[in-house]
């Protein structure tokens, strides 16, 4: 196929799609140019079905540093493992695409997005999401798309689609919404305590823009799309299915209705073992033994899936006996750990998270060096999910995509209420350790994080709580669930996480397993989540009503002063001479950023105060109208030079010494004498003029008697 080009204007920027020129051996490939961002997307599919019990979809988002004209860091000077941002973007693309493949699809699919050129004002992640959907749609891979995604900002009461970096900086909302032309199927958001009404409007505005992109994709697919390949879907033997349902469904239904998680798991596992043992014995010598046993396992999974959904939609009964809008028992504890800078333990039913706070000087902030300009990240929220939290053995090692994603969600939820750097000059790290899990552990980590911050004396603006909402839908009727547990998450249609304060929402995340949900469901889920959030906030308030007025004794003492940017070199000195001298004299640690924020760290408050005084004197400038207690340092015929402070001198002209005429400066002033002066002028060369007489009472004018005529 020869090169073909398609164009449209979207959100004020040119969107160009090129096909048929590069990566032609992939099942589908496109080059997407949006503004000056360029992304190559290639989609490939294995020829045979995999043997696993899940759909092996892999989505990658590869940031090439040359795209921003930068060298990679490190010794080898080449790209290594994906950055956190790249991992989160890959998840962002995966989530709306995954539901668009047929049930039982087991061929491996890889979608590789490579950022070739980066423009921070034209979203490369959204270009990659568009390219991923389009590459799959024009290929022969059986993909039930297209989908598309956009970013939405909220500035001065207006919604902006795919904002520039400057617009996003000013925005109260950072939202990514994706979906089909019929409905939304993925949401990721951070917000500055926005109302449910504004969030819902933002979602709908975003979906309108999504529909524009989908219409453009449909035009391209009509023009160049390939015929879809015939692939084998994982389907069970219907006769075997009917037989197992007839003989074992009642026993499995009873097991599913056991309320306590561990007891329920044991009961369902016992039923499954009986069924599997029966069929292993019957078909041990059968030539299709592996296929039959795979079908048996799949049928049992489908039966459990069907019973959980039936209970909720028909009987309005949840597996643990709760009402559809009922939260599991809650508990909140602070100061769980000694020595640390703050800690909180939050429990919701059989889900439990321990959050631990660590404070440090800004020199410990994380340096982010990606495609965007390098910056320091002050707040970090890390999430760990050990396998013992669900009573299982498993892999231990570096954080995976899921842990990185859950940590980022908690980070977005909590960073909206953190004090500014000027108010609280610390780098802040929260680590959430999931100790037990039966669903919604990411939201438990947010609640535990709030407890740890407040217990540690971080002056947050308001406590934040999170809740996970679920959905069971049969296409006609639906039920929205509050505080979903693991079974409801696994067999349900939606995982909709909402975090916020009493004033509004600070984070949203939604993933669904069906093709989309309606505005009505979104509105209902947000309303139920608000009610639940307030209930959880009451429990957090019971544990700690407000942030402690002081830090933990083990926390470092840090103070910060702001200096003019052009004074940074004065504090540092030639070759660091000045700052090294200050550190040697006071014993503190000092960190200065490029904006003039000076952080001073020590265990001794007196040393911090002494350092602040030294730096203040170094950067001090004379100001017109201010009064100084000065010392005479030089006398000339035309006036006296006085030292105001440090290396700043001023001239007191002979006419500014007194209101009466001064014949000789040396008659009224001597070197070393201390006098009060007022600055009256600073010229464009920085020379300072001061006055002594301006501080003295002006003598009355002498009366001039009138002459008699």
UniProtKB/Swiss-Prot annotation:
Record: residues binding Mg(2+): 489, 495
KW 4Fe-4S (keyword) present: no
Chief subcellular location: cytoplasm
Residue ranges of domain S1 motif in the record: 625-693
Keyword Transferase in annotation: yes
Keyword entries, A-Z: Cytoplasm, Magnesium, Metal-binding, Nucleotidyltransferase, RNA-binding, Transferase
Top EC category: transferase
Subcellular location: Cytoplasm
Reported cofactor(s): Mg(2+)
Residue intervals of the KH domain: 556-615
Catalysed reactions listed for this entry: RNA(n+1) + phosphate = RNA(n) + a ribonucleoside 5'-diphosphate
A molecular function (GO) term: 3'-5'-RNA exonuclease activity
Cellular component, GO annotation: cytosol
A biological process from GO: RNA processing
Matches recorded under InterPro entries: ExoRNase_PH_dom1, ExoRNase_PH_dom2, ExoRNase_PH_dom2_sf, KH_dom, KH_dom_type_1, KH_dom_type_1_sf, NA-bd_OB-fold, PNPase
Function text: Involved in mRNA degradation. Catalyzes the phosphorolysis of single-stranded polyribonucleotides processively in the 3'- to 5'-direction.
HAMAP family linked to this entry: PNPase
Similarity-based family: Belongs to the polyribonucleotide nucleotidyltransferase family.
The protein's name in its UniProt record: Polyribonucleotide nucleotidyltransferase
Natural source organism: Streptococcus agalactiae serotype III (strain NEM316)
């Amino acid at each position: 196929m020869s090169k073909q080009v398609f164009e449209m204007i979207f959100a004020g920027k040119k969107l160009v799609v090129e096909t048929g020129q590069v990566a032609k051996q992939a099942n589908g490939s496109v080059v997407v140019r949006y503004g000056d961002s360029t992304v190559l997307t290639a989609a490939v599919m294995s020829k045979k079905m995999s043997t696993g019990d899940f759909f092996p979809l892999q989505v990658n988002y590869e940031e090439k540093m040359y795209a921003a004209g930068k060298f990679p860091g490190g010794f080898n000077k080449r790209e290594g493992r994906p950055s956190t941002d790249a991992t989160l973007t890959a998840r962002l693309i995966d989530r709306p695409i995954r539901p668009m493949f047929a049930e039982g699809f087991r061929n491996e699919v890889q979608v590789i997005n490579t950022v070739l050129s980066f423009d921070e004002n034209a979203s490369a992640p959204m270009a990659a999401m568009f390219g991923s959907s389009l590459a799959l749609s024009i290929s022969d891979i059986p993909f039930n798309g297209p989908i598309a995604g956009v970013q939405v900002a909220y500035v001065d009461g207006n919604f902006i689609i795919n904002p520039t970096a400057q617009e996003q900086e000013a925005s109260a909302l950072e939202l990514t919404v994706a979906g089909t032309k019929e409905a939304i199927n993925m949401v990721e958001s951070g917000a500055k305590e926005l109302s449910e009404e504004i969030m819902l409007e933002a979602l709908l505005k975003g979906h309108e823009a999504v529909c524009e992109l989908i219409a453009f994709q449909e035009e391209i697919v009509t023009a160049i799309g390939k015929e879809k390949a015939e692939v084998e879907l994982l389907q069970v033997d219907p006769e075997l299915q009917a037989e197992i349902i007839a003989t074992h469904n009642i026993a499995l239904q009873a097991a599913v209705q056991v309320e306590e998680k561990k007891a329920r798991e044991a009961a369902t596992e016992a039923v499954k073992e009986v069924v599997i043992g029966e069929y292993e014995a019957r078909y041990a010598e059968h030539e299709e033994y592996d296929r039959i046993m795979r079908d048996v396992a799949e049928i049992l999974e489908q039966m459990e899936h069907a019973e959980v959904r039936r209970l909720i939609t028909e009987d309005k009964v949840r597996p643990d006996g709760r009402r559809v809008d009922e939260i599991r028992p809650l508990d909140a504890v602070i100061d769980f750990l000694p020595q640390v800078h703050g800690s909180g333990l939050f429990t919701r039913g059989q889900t439990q998270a321990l959050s631990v706070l660590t404070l440090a000087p800004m020199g410990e902030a994380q340096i982010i060096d990606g495609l965007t300009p390098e910056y320091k990240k002050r707040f970090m929220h890390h999430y760990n999910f050990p396998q013992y939290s669900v009573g299982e053995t498993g892999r231990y090692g570096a954080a995976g995509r899921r842990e990185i994603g859950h940590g980022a969600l908690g980070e977005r939820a909590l960073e909206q209420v953190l004090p500014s750097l000027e108010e609280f000059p610390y780098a802040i790290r929260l680590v959430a350790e999931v100790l037990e899990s039966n669903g919604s552990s990411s939201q438990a980590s947010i609640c535990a994080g709030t407890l740890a911050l407040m217990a540690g004396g971080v002056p947050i603006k308001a406590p934040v709580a999170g809740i996970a909402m679920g959905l069971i839908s049969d296409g006609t009727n639906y039920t929205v669930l509050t505080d979903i547990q693991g079974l409801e998450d696994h067999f349900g249609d939606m995982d909709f996480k909402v975090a916020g304060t009493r004033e509004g929402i600070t984070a949203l995340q939604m993933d669904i397993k069906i093709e989309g949900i309606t505005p009505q469901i979104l509105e209902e889920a947000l309303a139920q989540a608000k009610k639940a959030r307030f209930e959880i906030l009451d429990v957090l308030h019971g544990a700690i009503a407000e942030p402690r007025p002081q830090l933990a004794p083990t926390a470092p003492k840090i103070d910060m002063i702001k200096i003019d940017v052009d004074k940074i070199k004065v504090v540092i000195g030639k070759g660091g001479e000045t700052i090294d001298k200050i550190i040697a004299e006071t014993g503190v640690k000092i960190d200065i950023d490029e904006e003039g924020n000076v952080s001073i760290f020590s265990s001794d408050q007196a040393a911090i105060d002494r350092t602040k005084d030294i730096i203040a004197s170094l950067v001090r400038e004379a100001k017109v109208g201010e009064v100084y207690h000065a010392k005479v340092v030089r006398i000339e015929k035309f006036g006296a030079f006085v030292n105001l402070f440090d290396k700043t001198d001023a001239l007191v002209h002979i006419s500014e010494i007194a209101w009466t005429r001064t014949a000789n400066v040396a008659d009224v002033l001597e070197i070393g004498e201390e006098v009060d002066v007022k600055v009256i002028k600073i010229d464009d060369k920085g020379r300072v003029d001061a006055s002594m007489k301006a501080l003295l009472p002006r003598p009355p004018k002498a009366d001039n008697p009138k002459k008699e005529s």
